């Protein structure tokens, strides 16, 4: 059973927002401009979750692992970042239950923050345009600190900001990166079943609980000790 938290941090991509449609558009447009084969949404959905740099590299080599030639990567990154700046939220959407779940958390007085590996230049427009930025008292992006998830630093930074002990904090995410960061920071961790985890069932990573919609956090926390 979960212990009652005082602070809750929530991941963005794959947890609150399905951003794959925009990431696929940018990836395939980048590939087209480079004269390379398009990769499509099914592959992009498997590749997301470790930041834009890894997504671009995976698209270039058509594999989860591997490194493209540096000059090709630099050219691709320039194209992708320009595209994504204009396509952060045009096709992306909130998952069902997100607005309701966030509203409930705020109504109950939880301190709520956002921790993502997405760069700030993309995070703030995305959260703003989807209408959820005001739910968060702090937003920690992938370039806020020298380290990002699965390193515990972003989570511990938020705990310090709120003045709350890590053992009284909860992370809500969707991937093994979120689980690793939470365990290393001594946070509890709840995962959404539908997110981006490279095709692997998130239950295999043994989070404290798994839910199918953010609105289910209401029942989970109502039963917390």
Swiss-Prot record:
Keywords: Carbohydrate metabolism, Hydrolase, Magnesium, Metal-binding
Lineage: Bacteria, Pseudomonadati, Pseudomonadota, Gammaproteobacteria, Chromatiales
NCBIfam families: HAD-SF-IA-v1, HAD-SF-IA-v3, PGP_bact, PRK13222.1-2
Binding site residues for Mg(2+): 11, 13, 174
One Gene Ontology term, aspect cellular component: cytosol
Catalytic activity: 2-phosphoglycolate + H2O = glycolate + phosphate
GO BP annotation list: carbohydrate metabolic process; DNA repair; glycolate biosynthetic process
Annotated active site: 11 (nucleophile)
Molecular function GO labels: metal ion binding; phosphoglycolate phosphatase activity
Gene3D superfamilies: HAD superfamily/HAD-like, Putative phosphatase, domain 2
Similarity comment: Belongs to the HAD-like hydrolase superfamily. CbbY/CbbZ/Gph/YieH family.
Protein function: Specifically catalyzes the dephosphorylation of 2-phosphoglycolate. Is involved in the dissimilation of the intracellular 2-phosphoglycolate formed during the DNA repair of 3'-phosphoglycolate ends, a major class of DNA lesions induced by oxidative stress.
Magnesium in keyword set: yes
Protein name (database record): Phosphoglycolate phosphatase
Keyword Nucleotide-binding: no
Pathway it works in: Organic acid metabolism; glycolate biosynthesis; glycolate from 2-phosphoglycolate: step 1/1
Top-level EC class as recorded in UniProt: hydrolase
Domain of life from the UniProt record: Bacteria
Cofactor field: Mg(2+)
EC number: 3.1.3.18
């Amino acid at each position: 059973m979960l212990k009652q938290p005082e602070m809750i941090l929530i991941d963005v991509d794959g947890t609150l927002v399905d951003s794959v449609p925009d990431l696929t558009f940018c990836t395939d447009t980048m590939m087209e401009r480079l004269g390379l084969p398009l990769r499509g949404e099914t592959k992009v959905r498997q590749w997301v979750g470790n930041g834009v740099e890894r997504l671009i590299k995976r698209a270039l080599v058509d594999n989860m692992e591997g490194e493209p030639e540096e000059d090709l990567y630099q050219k691709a990154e320039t194209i992708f970042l320009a595209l994504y700046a204009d396509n952060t939220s045009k096709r992306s959407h909130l998952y069902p239950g997100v607005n309701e779940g966030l509203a409930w958390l705020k109504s109950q007085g939880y301190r709520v923050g956002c921790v993502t590996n997405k760069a700030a230049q993309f995070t703030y427009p995305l959260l703003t345009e989807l209408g959820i930025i005001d739910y968060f008292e702090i937003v920690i992006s992938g370039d806020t600190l020298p380290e990002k998830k699965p390193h515990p630093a972003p989570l511990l930074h938020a705990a310090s900001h709120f003045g709350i002990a890590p053992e009284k904090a909860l992370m809500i995410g969707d991937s093994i990166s979120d689980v690793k960061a939470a365990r290393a920071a001594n946070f509890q961790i709840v995962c959404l079943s539908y997110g981006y985890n490279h095709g692997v069932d998130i239950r295999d990573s043994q989070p404290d609980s798994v839910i199918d919609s953010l609105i289910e956090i209401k029942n989970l926390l109502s039963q917390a000790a």
